[in-house]
A protein has these predicted regions:
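N-terminal maturation segment of proteins
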Residues: 4-247
Length: 247
């Protein structure tokens, strides 16, 4: 009975630990959370702020320190007393944290603005495919739009630090990224209301209205706010990023 009690205790501690780590990871990026889980409340995530993850100077050091802290906490859990399923998860988590810790020593090897799959081109796609299941999803989405300028500014800071460290991307790649920034959110399409971030947004709102989740008045209000944010936040953010890459 004592052995069974110890096993249960170890499993409980491990599951509490992994649940906490999961919640921290999810609430650090609303985009990641939304594409990972449909119902955050089912995972104990009920009070969160919609955020895009911003890069800050020294972030790699902080990330390494967090990985080290999590590995220390993980090591305090008796691996040999875990269930087979939890033991397997333990091994995977430990390996992942160790890899992240090793990568933290190479802070400028990432390329978030890659010409082929950088966030300048991926973010609009993620936004266009952002599923609306509730009114909260819509308000989260609009809050994320309102942070695109800060998000791109943080990526530009990262690129500037990379350049100072001798890791600036080649000129041909910079030119491709700049061209993408100049063409992804054209002012003309926004003025005409034909940009895909306008049309897909309206389509999703119409579905919520058909389900009785949103009224016509609320839909109209959300459409106006989306247009405002695309025009005053998102489009200028792309222009600023394009200019900053060559400054």
């Amino acid at each position: 009975m004592a052995l069974l009690s110890h096993c249960t205790s170890a499993d409980r501690r491990f599951e509490q630990f992994t649940s906490r780590v999961f919640r921290e990871e999810m609430t650090a990026s609303t985009l990641n959370m939304h594409y990972t889980i449909a119902d955050p409340a089912a995972f104990g995530i009920t009070d969160y702020e919609p955020v895009l993850p911003l890069y800050t100077s020294g972030q790699s050091d902080a990330s390494g320190e967090r990985c080290s802290a999590l590995l220390r906490q993980l090591s305090c859990i008796a691996y040999d007393k875990l269930s087979p399923e939890n033991a397997f998860t333990y091994t995977l988590l430990q390996r992942s944290l160790e890899n992240d810790l090793a990568l933290a020593q190479f802070p400028y090897y990432n390329e978030p603005l890659s010409p082929s799959s950088g966030m300048q081109s991926q973010l609009p796609i993620l936004l266009a495919e952002y599923t609306f299941r509730s009114r909260r999803d819509v308000t989260d989405y609009l809050a994320l739009l309102d942070q695109v300028d800060d998000y791109f500014a943080s990526l530009l800071l990262y690129e500037q630090e990379k350049a100072a460290a001798g890791f600036l991307m080649p000129d041909v790649s910079l030119e491709k990224v700049q061209k993408q920034c100049d063409t992804i959110v054209p002012i003309q399409e926004l003025a005409q209301g034909t940009h895909f971030l306008q049309t897909t947004f309206e389509d999703r709102l119409v579905e919520l209205q058909a389900q009785g989740i949103l009224s016509a008045e609320v839909v109209s209000s959300f459409l106006k706010e989306n247009d405002r944010l695309l025009t005053t936040v998102v489009q200028p953010a792309y222009a600023t990023l394009s200019e900053g890459l060559y400054s």
